[in-house]
Amino acid sequence: MKTLSTQRLLRGMLPVAMLMLMGAWQAPALAASCTQGSTCVTVDGSNSGAMSTEAARQSKQQFNDTKSLRNKVNTRVEKEFDKVDKAIDSEERCDDSLNVNAYWEPNTRKCLDRQTGRQINP
């Protein structure tokens, strides 16, 4: 009997405790004002000052700089991939060649003639 009344008490108090916790958590957020160093969101745009404009400009500039850097890195990776891919295709063509004097030189990534040492196109 005692456990039943304790369970009823906990069931009744739990929603009230949750509401109080949510209210206590939101109170500082609602009381905070837009000061320097805090994050402020405006809906109508009437609170646009010089600092927020400068911060937005710097953020955009940083994004553009990192975007440019990412593009350079991606271009370099693509070039390296294309170079390796072309070398693999050339090696396969050289190995499948009907020319018995053709061999693949891995250091230079070229198909060479065994007798003359010159590059050949199989």
Curated annotation (Swiss-Prot):
InterPro entries named in the record: DUF1283 (IPR009700)
Residues spanning the signal sequence: 1-31
Region (Disordered): which ranges? 46-71
Which keywords fit this entry according to its UniProt record? Signal
Top-rank taxon, per record: Bacteria
Q: Which family does it belong to?
A: Belongs to the UPF0482 family.
- Give the protein's recorded name: UPF0482 protein Spro_2288
Q: Which organism is it from?
A: Serratia proteamaculans (strain 568)
